[in-house]
């Protein structure tokens, strides 16, 4: 059975959806651990309640990205993952970290890449006047939000959408995993 480590920074809504899918009999993987760069991330409580190993490693405790990523890699490696999923992990990873896990590191991004990389994707979609928005699962490369696409899911952008409403449309029924 494949082992997955999930990295989060907040409430873990994508992680929660993965936990639900992982509970299905036919899912060929085990979520081995959830790790957050925010010690008070609400998603850690959700993972603990589901019986999943959790850890927090505060990026503010490290003077630079390289040292943080090295410590994060040590923590990840303790769980011997086959796959590392960035599910709302709000840190840009160093090329060293990305290269270490190349081909095993995927991201869940809240837009239809290559459109709207980076932050505030829902507002970007509304401002651009697009009629559809969505989410992308892609392999992580050193270039932000540019790795090969694995899957995408589409939702309509409604005329009265705000950034918060767009978040709701994209959240549950259209997750691309």
PLM segments and residue spans:
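N-terminal Rossmann-like dinucleotide-binding module
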Residues: 1-42
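Mobile beta-alpha loop/short-helix "lid" or hinge segments that flank ligand
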Residues: 42-45, 93-95, 138-159
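Hydrophobic beta-strand scaffold residues
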Residues: 54-55, 83, 105, 132
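Short beta->alpha connector loops at strand-helix junctions that form conserved
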Residues: 55-60, 108
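Helix-adjacent hinge/juxtasegments
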Residues: 65-108, 113-114
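Short, glycine-/small-residue-rich phosphate/pyrophosphate-handling segment
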Residues: 118-150
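Single conserved hydrophobic/aromatic residue that forms the stacking wall/gate
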Residues: 168-177
């Amino acid at each position: 059975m494949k082992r997955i480590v999930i990295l989060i920074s907040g409430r873990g809504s994508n992680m929660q959806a993965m936990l639900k899918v992982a509970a299905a009999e036919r899912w060929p993987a085990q979520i081995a651990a959830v790790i957050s760069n925010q010690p008070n991330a609400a998603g850690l409580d959700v993972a603990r309640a589901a019986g999943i190993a959790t850890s927090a490693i505060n990026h503010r405790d490290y003077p630079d990205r390289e040292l943080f990523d090295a410590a994060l890699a040590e923590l990840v490696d303790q769980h011997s993952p086959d796959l590392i999923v960035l599910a709302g992990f709000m840190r840009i990873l160093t090329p060293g970290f990305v290269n270490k896990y190349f081909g095993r590191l995927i991201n869940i991004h809240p837009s239809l890449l290559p459109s709207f990389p980076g932050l505030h994707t829902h507002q970007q979609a509304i401002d651009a006047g697009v009629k559809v928005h969505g989410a992308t699962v892609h392999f992580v490369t050193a270039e932000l939000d540019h790795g090969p696409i694995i899957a995408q899911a589409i939702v309509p952008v409604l005329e009265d959408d705000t950034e918060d409403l767009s978040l709701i449309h994209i959240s549950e029924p259209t997750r691309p995993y």
